[in-house]
Amino acid sequence: MVKEECKALLDALSRVTACYRHMVLTIGGTSDSQNLREELKKTRQKAQELAVANRNKLTTVLRDKTVSKEDKAEFERLWVIFSTCLEILEIDMRRALELGHEFPLNVPKKHLIQTGMSGGTSGVAARAMSVQNMKYEAEHNIDVVDLKDLENEINQVGEMMYEMEMKVNVPQWTVEAKQDPGAELKSTISVGASSIGMISVEENKSFCDISKVLAGIIFSAVLIIAIVLAVCVVKLS
């Protein structure tokens, strides 16, 4: 039961962290707006709430001496994944802080980056928050006011990571993975791989056929030239 709860919390944190990274990449782009800045704030706060819940659950379990060896190994694996999610969140929060300073919304002379991306991010934020539609309530100067809060929250995440290392010592290199790197992607990739593979095979076949024809033409031309030259040499002699 506890293991399933930890996995569910970790899955939620991973999803929200991924959504946050997606939105951070749009800061300063043509999709940037006041709504985006509010979505970023709510999403990162949601991620921090999930991080605290994950930390509390996993810390309690890993410090429990009655946990079996097999279960402890599984919880240590979850702990490593959780630590990685937290590191990624901190990196993206720092990136959001830098881009927020670099691209304030209410400075008309500051040109936005033409990233080629278009459309809003409300759908991504709604998935992260597990709501049907996002509600926007922030002030018009959220892009400036929120930067100080973001800086404080970055420090809080850093302190959390430090406390985690002090309370639970799980070196990442001691934890064995349950599957090969990228194995979780194979199931999704293989769905479309067969159709794509068939197309690529047909393309390769047609390309090979054309190559054979060209090679035959070139060989024939060289052979004809050689015969003509031989005849000319015989006549001249």
UniProtKB/Swiss-Prot annotation:
Compartments where found: Membrane
Annotated tissue distribution: Expressed in a variety of neuronal tissues, particularly in sensory cells including inner ear hair cells, photoreceptors and dorsal root ganglion neurons.
Keyword check for Transmembrane: yes
Residue intervals passing through the bilayer: 213-233
GO annotation terms (biological process): detection of light stimulus involved in visual perception; G protein-coupled receptor signaling pathway; negative regulation of signal transduction
Keyword Transport: no
GO cellular component, one term: membrane
InterPro entries in the record: RGS7BP/RGS9BP
Membrane topology: Single-pass type IV membrane protein
Extracellular face residues: 234-237
Lineage: superkingdom: Eukaryota
Coiled-coil portions: 29-58, 135-169
Intervals, Cytoplasmic compartment: 1-212
Alphabetical keyword list: Coiled coil, Membrane, Signal transduction inhibitor, Transmembrane, Transmembrane helix
PANTHER family per UniProt: R-SEVEN BINDING PROTEIN (R7BP) HOMOLOG
Family, as annotated: Belongs to the RGS7BP/RGS9BP family.
Its biological purpose: Regulator of G protein-coupled receptor (GPCR) signaling. Probably acts by regulating the activity of some 'R7' family protein (RGS6, RGS7, RGS9 and/or RGS11).
Name under which the protein is recorded: Regulator of G-protein signaling 9-binding protein
Encoding gene per record: RGS9BP
